[in-house]
Structure formats: C-alpha cells, structure tokens
C-alpha cells in the first residue's frame, strides 16, 4: 500500500502570486535536488536550513530559475521523511519545468493528499488530525479555522485516547476477574468499578456528541430562513442581502417552488440564507411539495424571518403562518417589507395586532435597500447569542458522530441492562467493551484502516498536500 519512493508535486495554487513552491518527500529527495541545483560550496546542506541557488537542466546545462531550497530531514518534517521545498518564481511554466526535471531523476508525481497520507502512515499525525488538516484548508470562518487548528495542534483525539485508556483498564480488570473468579476477586468491587467507569464514559461520550451540532454551526454557518405567504418580497430580500440576483423575482405568486440558498459573510460570521416557497393553500402539486419542504425546513434553521407585506397588512394567510411558528416554538423575527410604498396606516395596524406577541419587528424595503443594515445586525445579534465555547481537544465530524452514537448505545445498554440483571454475564460485557474499544480505535486511527477508506479520505486533498 505504501511505496517508500520519493514523490514530488507543486504545492501552491497555479493562479499566480509571488512564489511557487515544489515539495519533495522521500529518502532520495535531498540527493535529487543536489543533482539538479547549483548551490555555492560555502552553504551547508543541514536540516532546517535555507539555501540559495539555481535549478538547472542537466540535459543541456541550461539554468531554469533562481530558487530558495528548504531542507527538513527526517523525522522533523511534515511527512516524517526527508522533505525538500523548492521556492521558485510564481510562473506555472517554470514550476512545471522544474517538476519535469525532478521526474527525470526518478522522482514520482505525488497523488492527491499523499504527503499527508505519509505523515499519517509514519505516525506523525492521527486520523482525526488528517481530517483537521482538510478542515483548516477549507474553513470559511475564523472560528472554524481556529477549531481545526486547535484539533491539529493538540493531537486531535486526546479525550478519545483518555477514554480508550480508561476502558482498556476496565476491560483488563474484568478479564482478570473472569480468569480468577474462583480464587480471590471481590465481586462487589468489580461491579462497582463497571458501573462507575461506564457511567463516567457515557457522560464523556454524550458531551462529544453534543459538540457535533456546535461544530456544524461553525462549519456550515448560521442558517437563516425567510418565510411568508407568496409575493411578500422574500426573494427580493434574499437578493438584497446577497447583493446579487440569487432568486427569481416576478409578480406571479408561487414563483419560488424550491428552497433557494445563498452563502455570505457578515463580519466574521458565515450565514446561509434560504428563500422558501410561499406558504398558502395551493392546488398545484409541485407548489404543494415546495410548501411542504418549507414547513419541514424551518425547524432546521437557527433564525427565521417571517415577512409581511406592508401594502396588504396582516392577512388571514399571515395569521396561519404566525400561529404555526408559535406552535413550533421558533424564535422568529417579523419583517415588514415594502415600507417605501407610504402605507403607514397598514404598518400601524400590524404593530397594533402583534403588540402582545413580544416579537422583534424590523421595517424594511428590499427594493429601496431600507432597513438592511438593521436586518444584518439582527442576524449577527441572534447568531452571537448562540455562540459557545469551542471544544478544547476534539471536533466531532459526521463519521465520528455515527461511531460515537453506536458506542453510546452499547455502553448505555450495559449500564441500564446487563449490570442490573440478577446474574451478570461478565463474558458478554467483555465482548461489548472490546466492540467499544474497536470503535474508538477507528476514530484515533490506531486500528488498521482499510485501503479504500484511506483512499476516500486522502482523495479530498489537493496534489501537493
């Protein structure tokens, strides 16, 4: 699976800049670079030194580019192998030419994520850290980047490793009890240890599982849903906030039949805006499906904007939606749109009708861009109220969540079921604890991972990482 040959790739984006970087990793990387470079004799090829020189083509002895060469000898490198970086001028033509010269010296082109895969296979980082590298690269907010970097720096899975250590000791004590139960083992003592350790483990796992929703908000952004009856200006509001036409706007009710989304940054907050199908009684089957999806989707959003039409005032259709939101126990904000139409009497009637609801009301005009600053501040305000302390050691992703849920079910069944029976089957508990440890090993990467699983993880990386 793991070829110990020397690999190379361009590590920087091809879209220009000041410098292009080529990266090599493997036992022959330093010798290869020595062969294709001209470096003055007073410079030493020592680890973690920077050399100045030229890359040359040995075929015609021509010079290709002026470069800096960074040396990182094993194991003090990203891959824990000998790593060399060549910094040349930011020309994709030059970078490709240097790469061609390296390949002619017997270096292989790296596959996507192969440098990080080598770091994992050489034991420098764990599997959770591998995924944190990917999260750092693809993070869209400062908070999510910090969380991923924190996971990467701390080894990613310290809490999981502590949990695994605790349960391993428990399993060892249990197996000792099983083997020597006829001699001198105190039955009450082992049962107390089982109950105490499993209970504390359940609390730890529950805390990790609960962090998933928090981390999801960081990675996916605050979900903001715009709802209301047809033609109140939901699509226009989305377009106004997005500052571009994301959603089709017409005078015909029911134009939006599916959920339209747009992602934007408000300050340091990632926001996902959703324009939804207008909620009303409809005979059109396709529109009815869109309305049904809207009603289900509202429950997933952290912020709901309920849009009213200042021209029409509060209608019976609006009242139906208002009551539905109250029944769902959603903390929604009321937007009175089209206030530029000089309909203050209707606006006053809306305030009078809703004065007992204690809902925040914002007056806006999507067409004239009135009230949008208040709207954006409202999003930031409500989003910040859902802020939380970042998990210190570990961020749970979707795959780990499934494993942790299964582990929780196993331990919960042991705690509430097996340990409360008149006759406790210690052999069964030992088997279940081994299943738990196997699951924890999958998270830390300590268990041998199938080739296709590794390939799936590292295929998400770019070449050069």
UniProtKB/Swiss-Prot annotation:
Its EC number is 3.6.-.-. One of its GO terms (molecular function) is GTPase activity. It is found in: Plastid, Chloroplast. Keywords: Chloroplast, GTP-binding, Hydrolase, Magnesium, Metal-binding, Nucleotide-binding, Plastid, Potassium, tRNA processing. Coiled coil: none annotated. (6S)-5-formyl-5,6,7,8-tetrahydrofolate binds at residues 23, 85, 124, 465. Binds 1 potassium ion per subunit. SUPFAM superfamilies: P-loop containing nucleoside triphosphate hydrolases. CDD domains: trmE, TrmE_N. It holds the Pfam family MnmE_helical. Residues 221-384 form the TrmE-type G domain. GO terms for biological process: tRNA methylation; tRNA wobble uridine modification. InterPro entries: G_TrmE (IPR031168), GTP-bd (IPR006073), GTP-bd_TrmE_N (IPR018948), GTPase_MnmE (IPR004520), MnmE_dom2 (IPR027368), MnmE_helical (IPR025867), P-loop_NTPase (IPR027417), Small_GTP-bd (IPR005225). GTP binds at residues 231-236, 250-256, 275-278. PROSITE patterns: G_TRME. It is an enzyme of class 3 (hydrolase). Exhibits a very high intrinsic GTPase hydrolysis rate. Involved in the addition of a carboxymethylaminomethyl (cmnm) group at the wobble position (U34) of certain tRNAs, forming tRNA-cmnm(5)s(2)U34. It comes from Cyanidium caldarium. Mg(2+) binds at residues 235, 256. Its main location: plastid. GO terms for cellular component: chloroplast; cytosol. This is Probable tRNA modification GTPase MnmE. Belongs to the TRAFAC class TrmE-Era-EngA-EngB-Septin-like GTPase superfamily. TrmE GTPase family. Its cofactor is K(+).
């Amino acid at each position: 699976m793991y070829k110990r040959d020397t690999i190379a790739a361009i590590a920087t984006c091809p879209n220009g800049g000041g410098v292009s970087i080529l990266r090599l990793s493997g036992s022959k990387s330093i010798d290869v670079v020595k062969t294709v470079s001209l470096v003055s004799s007073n410079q030493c090829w020592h680890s973690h030194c920077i050399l100045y020189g030229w890359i040359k083509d040995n075929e015609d002895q021509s010079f290709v580019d002026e470069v800096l060469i960074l040396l990182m000898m094993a194991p003090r490198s990203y891959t824990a192998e000998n790593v060399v970086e060549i910094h040349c001028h930011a020309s994709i033509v030059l970078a490709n030419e240097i790469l061609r010269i390296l390949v002619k010296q017997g270096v292989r082109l790296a596959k996507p994520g192969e440098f990080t895969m080598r770091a994992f296979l050489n034991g420098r980082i764990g599997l959770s850290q591998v995924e944190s590298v990917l999260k750092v690269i693809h993070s869209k907010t400062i908070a999510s980047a910090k969380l991923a970097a924190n996971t990467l720096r701390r080894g990613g899975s310290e809490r999981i490793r502590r949990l695994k250590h605790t349960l391993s000791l428990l399993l060892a004590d249990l197996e000792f009890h099983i083997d020597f139960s006829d001699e001198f083992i105190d039955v009450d003592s082992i049962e107390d240890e089982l109950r105490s350790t499993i209970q504390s483990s359940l609390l730890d796992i529950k805390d990790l599982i609960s962090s998933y929703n928090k981390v999801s908000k960081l990675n996916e952004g605050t979900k903001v849903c715009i709802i209301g009856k047809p033609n109140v200006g939901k699509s226009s509001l989305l377009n106004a906030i997005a500052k571009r036409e994301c959603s089709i706007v017409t005078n015909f009710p029911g134009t939006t039949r599916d959920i339209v989304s747009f992602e934007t940054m408000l300050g340091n907050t990632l926001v996902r805006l959703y324009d939804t199908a207008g909620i009303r009684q409809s005979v059109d089957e396709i529109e009815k499906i869109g309305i049904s999806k809207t009603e289900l989707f509202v429950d997933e959003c952290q912020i709901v904007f309920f849009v009213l039409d200042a021209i029409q005032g509060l209608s019976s259709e609006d009242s139906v939606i208002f009551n539905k939101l109250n029944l769902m126990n959603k903390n929604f904000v009321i937007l009175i749109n089209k206030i530029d139409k000089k309909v203050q009497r209707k606006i006053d009637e809306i305030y009078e009708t809703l004065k007992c609801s204690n809902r925040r009301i914002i007056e806006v005009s999507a067409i004239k861009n009135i009230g949008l600053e208040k709207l954006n501040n409202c999003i930031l305000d409500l989003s910040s109220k859902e802020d939380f302390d970042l998990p210190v050691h570990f961020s749970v992703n979707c795959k780990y969540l499934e494993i942790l849920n299964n582990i929780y079910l196993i331990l919960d069944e042991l705690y509430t079921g097996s340990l409360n029976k008149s006759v406790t089957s210690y052999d069964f508990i030992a088997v279940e604890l081994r299943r738990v440890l196997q699951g924890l090993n999958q998270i830390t990467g300590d268990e041998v991972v199938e080739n296709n699983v590794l390939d799936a993880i590292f295929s998400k990386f770019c070449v050069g990482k």
